C-alpha cells in the first residue's frame, strides 16, 4: 500500500450524476485514474475525457501539474483538451450567430489554460481568429445596426481569446499580417467603440510593439500619438492605463534617432498636460498599474537626456564654446568688446580668464575642458544655460554674490553645476531601463515641459543657500554636496505634487534641520553603545525577536495579494496567499481583480501544508528566476522573488509587490520553518523596538511614570481671534 503522502482525497463531479469521493494515487498514470473514474460512471472511450478543477479557473489536470492537487480539492470530469479544442474550433465557424457567440465566450474562458491553448493552437486556431477579425468585421457590417450588442460581444470575445492564447508564448508575434495589424489599429483609431474591444486592441498593440521589431515599425505607421490622446481624456482609468502603455512601448522600442522626434511630437500634442489634468489630478485614486505606467513614462522621458549626459564637449567646437561665452555675457553684461588689435587681445584673454574664475570653472583659461567628463558631459552646460536664460535674476545674483566673496568662501557655480547635474542624474537613474515592478513616479515632473531643467534650477539655488548656511570653503565642497543630496532625497520622498511644493519642502530642510536630524541619530547611537546598555539589549533581544516573529506570522494570516508577471507584458492578474490562523496551512488561489481587504480562506482554492515545506529560496535561486526571459535580467524583480519548495520538484513562486512585503513573507516563512529572520526589515524593527524598550526601562529607573492613556484633548478656545493670515 502506498504511503499516505501519495494518496489524495478528492471529490469528482460529472453533469447529471452525484459527485464521487475518491482517493487518487499520485503514483498511478493520470490516464489510469481517468479510466477508473469513467468506469465508475460507465463511460466508454476514456481517452476522450480529462479532469479539471471545478473552481472558476477550470484548468485541466495534467501530468505536469497533478502534484498541485490537495486533499479536499473538487475536480470535474470533462471532455479532453483535444476534444474540447476540436469542438470549439468547429463551433466558432457556425453559421448561427448565437452558436458562434456562445462558442467564442467559452473559448475566451478556456484559453487561459495553457493545456487547452496548446491543443487549440495545434489546430491553427490563432490563424482562424485572425481571419475572423480581418474579414468577419466586414461580413457582419450590415448586421451592426440591427445586432450591434451581439456583434460587439462577438468581437470582444474573439480578441479576448486571442490575447489569452498569445500570452502563453507558444506562437511568435512575427507571424501576423499587415491586414490584421491595420484592423486592430482601426479599432483604436475609432472615436466610438466598445470599451472591452478598445482595451483588448490596445493590449494587442502593446504586445506587438514589445515583442517584435518588425511589428513595431508596422504599428508605428498605423497609430499616431494624436489618435491615442482622446483615450486619455476619457474617464475609464483602465483604458487610460493601456493607452499610456502603448505610448511607452512605442517610446521604448523606437530607434535612438526616432526617440527625440517622438518626444517632440508628445510635447506638441501636450501629452504631459493631458496626463496631468485627466489622470494625475483626476478625482480618483491612481491604481498600481497606472502608477507603474506613469513611472515608465517618467523614466523614458528622463532617458532622453542620456545622449547629452554621455557627450563630451569638443573644445574646438565654436558653437559649444559660444554657450560658455553666453553664460559669461549674461552674468557680467560686457558693455563693448575691446578693439580687435594685438594689444587688446591680451587684455581680452585676461578679462575672460578673470570672468571664468568668477563663474566658478575649474579651468579658468579653457572652461570647455570642465565638460569633458561623462557623466554629466554636455548636460551640465545645457542646465547652466537654461538657468541663466530662464532664471536670469537668480543666476546673476548667485554669480555676483560669489564673485564678491573672499576666495576661500566662494561657491563655484561652474563646478557646482557640473557635480549637481551628475548627482541629479544618479538620483533619477537617467539611462537605466524602467523596472518591471516599480511604480515610483513623481507628480511634480508632469507639471512642466522642462521638468529636469527646472529641477536643476531649484537645486542649484538650494546648493548656494546651503553653502552659505554651512559657511563652506572650497575644501568643504564634497560635504556640501552630501548635505544637498540628503535634502533633495528627503524632499522627494514626500512626493510633492508640484515644483513649487518641492521648493517649499526644501525650505524646511535647511542645513540646521539636517544637522538636528543627524545629531539626533548620532546621540541615539552613542547613548546605546555603553556596556550596561549592551548587556540589557542582549538580555531582552530574544523577547523582542519573539514579538517580531508574532507580528510576521499575524501578517501572513492576514495575507497578501500578489501580481502575476511574465516576460512578455504586465497583466492585471492577481493571486492571494494567506496563512491559516493555526499556522498549519497556506491557502492560495487566483483572483479576477485586486481585492479590497482580506480574502476569506474558503474562497482560496488551493492549500499547502506548512509541514510539506522543504525550503524557502530567494532571488536567483528561485525556479521562476532561472527560466529564460526578460524577468531574469531585471535586478529589481530578482530582489522581490522568493519560492517555497515542497514535495519533489514542486514549488510555489512569488514576486512580492514591494520590498516591505518581501521581507514580511520571507521572515514569516523562515519563522514557520524555525529559521532565523534575516531581512533588513527585521534588523530595523529590532533596533527600533530595542531602543524603545530600553528608553522605557531607563525612564522606569528614574521613577518616571508612563501613563497608560494619552493626555485628554483640551476644550476648544472661546474664540479664534488669535488666528491670522500671515500672507
Swiss-Prot record:
Pfam families: ELMO_ARM, ELMO_CED12, PH_12. InterPro entries: ARM-like (IPR011989), ARM-type_fold (IPR016024), ELMO_ARM (IPR024574), ELMO_dom (IPR006816), ELMO_domain-containing (IPR050868), PH-like_dom_sf (IPR011993), PH_domain (IPR001849). GO terms for molecular function: SH3 domain binding. A motif (SH3-binding) lies at residues 707-714. It is found in: Cytoplasm; Cell membrane. One of its GO terms (biological process) is regulation of postsynapse assembly. The modification N6-acetyllysine is found at residues 100, 105. Residues 319-492 form the ELMO domain. Residues 555-676 form the PH domain. The modification Phosphoserine is found at residue 344. One of its GO terms (cellular component) is plasma membrane. Phosphorylated by HCK. Widely expressed, with a higher expression in the spleen and placenta. SUPFAM superfamilies: ARM repeat, PH domain-like. Keywords: Acetylation, Apoptosis, Cell membrane, Cytoplasm, Membrane, Phagocytosis, Phosphoprotein, SH3-binding. Involved in cytoskeletal rearrangements required for phagocytosis of apoptotic cells and cell motility. Acts in association with DOCK1 and CRK. Was initially proposed to be required in complex with DOCK1 to activate Rac Rho small GTPases. May enhance the guanine nucleotide exchange factor (GEF) activity of DOCK1. Interacts with ADGRB1. Interacts directly with the SH3-domain of DOCK1 via its SH3-binding site. Part of a complex with DOCK1 and RAC1. Part of a complex with DOCK1 and CRK isoform CRK-II. Interacts with PLEKHG6. Interacts with HCK (via SH3 domain). Interacts with ADGRB3. Interacts with DOCK5. This is Engulfment and cell motility protein 1. It comes from Homo sapiens (Human). The gene is ELMO1.
